[in-house]
Amino acid sequence: MENRSSSGTPRPSAGSPDAAKRPSETSPAAGRIPAGQNGSSGDKKRKVTEEGEASEKSEPPADRPMSKRKRMEERHQKLRKRGRTPPSAYSRRDAEAAPVPNRNRDDPANRSLSPLPHRSPTPEEQPRQRKRPGGGARMGLVDRETLRRRQEERERALVEEAMRTSQGRGVTDVVRQHYNAVPQRGREWRKTESKIKGLRSFNNWIKSTLIQKFSPDEEFLARLNDGRDWADDSGPPPAEEKRLLVVDLGCGKGGDLGKWQLAPQPVELYVGLDPAEVSIVQARERYNSMKSGRGNRGRRNPLFHGEFAPKDCFGEWLGDIGIVQQVGIDPNAGPGGSVMSSRWGGGGFDVVASMFAIHYAFESEEKARQMLRNVAGCLKKGGRFLGVCPNSDIISARVVELNAKRKAREEQEKKEKSDEAPEDGEVEEDTKLEWGNSIYRVQFPGKTPEDGIFRPPFGWKYSYFMEEAVEEVPEYVVPWEAFRALTEDYNLELQYRKPFLGIWGDEKDDRELGPLSERMGVRDRNTGELLMTEEEKEAANFYHAFCFYKV
């Protein structure tokens, strides 16, 4: 039997080998003290027990179990010595799934014991083809060629669009700079010193005739011309009954302000627009002079309210001008608008005028359509579009005539030089056409159609010169039939078209316009003769006038 101390710790017996090896710990005789000298026997037992506990703390017995923490530390140390990383707390979560061996279903050992027929593998189990980088872009030569052609077409379209935009800005800037540079001359100079005073007066009379005949609305004209059309036989309407709202595209220096003040149906609002900023300033100054009473010359109608703004009327939308927005402009005018808008919609203006200006819009189809969209958008139903522009019939006749003469001359030269070889460096004959006289000149820089039909109808540029007025400014042919067909897309119906000299023949004896021509210095009061030279008549015949109705 083992002897136990008071603390319950087992103690080896006297005959065990441990007792022989450590006599100081187990033998009572090794540290025995005589009784009665240093305390009682209980004190001796307590002292021996405390010494045994101290020795047990310093050296644990070999058979005492090791703690779990210490075992883990020793294990980690061994793994580090072998070059392996000990597992972390996340080793189970992050451990990769063990690869599942590819089982051969044909092997009888791997075959399922189910009596049901074997099911085909699901799409997820089928092997997937690997996609190589850029594999979708690899295609045949035909597809690559198609893509290349499309890319080239897109790039070419972008370049052409950029060129058209830059060229459009260039022509507009040239025209703007030219009219900004034209000096302001007074009325006295135009009547006495001008070389083309007869042509100036005649052109002003033509514009006055157009305003007198076509600016009033149908109701006003019916009451003015024939009171019997009305049940009450009231005669001409009073001036305050209905007044006109007018917008002038290309108003210049305001030379037509007086003509609009003399309109049969009084004007309530006049909006003048022009791309030349200097011209707008001068037009505003002329209007302020008329408003203050200077140069009014006793006109019967009160002066209308006038608004002026610089604007490219053919290359830009007019809807961002404040006064135009207030009066009203239809953004749906034209072929892209809705059916209801074209039938019931419209702007708020009674008249849109454009004198000697619309030929600048025929640089391109885009500009021509933008011009007509502005016109149709401003006009109310029944409104009028008045204007004058170069006569394409005159231009075509001249082109056919000059091309025929050039062709005959070339054939004659070929017959004369049929045996002669062309010399080195010989330049081909210039194909440009030119005609005019001392006061005006028209010149086409390149080839022109021999039959006089301009196809396509846009972009046929020529240079025009007019003494004291226009200095070699680029203009564009307005092929009339193409223009008339284009206006139908904007609900504009042609009502009137006449060359300048034809208007004179029709209206010179009118009871109102005849005396007006005498007051304006167009006709001699005594002889009735037209006060223009033959060269001025030729220059005047280059133009014609027109009027469209908004339907």
Curated annotation (Swiss-Prot):
Q: Which domain of life is it from?
A: Eukaryota
User: What residues does mRNA bind to?
Assistant: N203, N204
Domain called mRNA cap 0 methyltransferase: residue spans: 194-551
Q: Which UniProt keywords apply?
A: Methyltransferase, mRNA capping, mRNA processing, Nucleus, RNA-binding, S-adenosyl-L-methionine, Transferase
Q: Where is this site: mRNA cap binding?
A: K253, K259, R286, H359, E475, Y543
User: Is NADP found in the keyword set?
Assistant: no
Q: Where is the composition biased (Polar residues)?
A: 1-10
- Gene Ontology CC annotations of this record: nucleus
Q: Composition bias, kind Acidic residues: at what positions?
A: 421-430
Family of this protein = Belongs to the class I-like SAM-binding methyltransferase superfamily. mRNA cap 0 methyltransferase family.
Q: What is this protein called?
A: mRNA cap guanine-N(7) methyltransferase
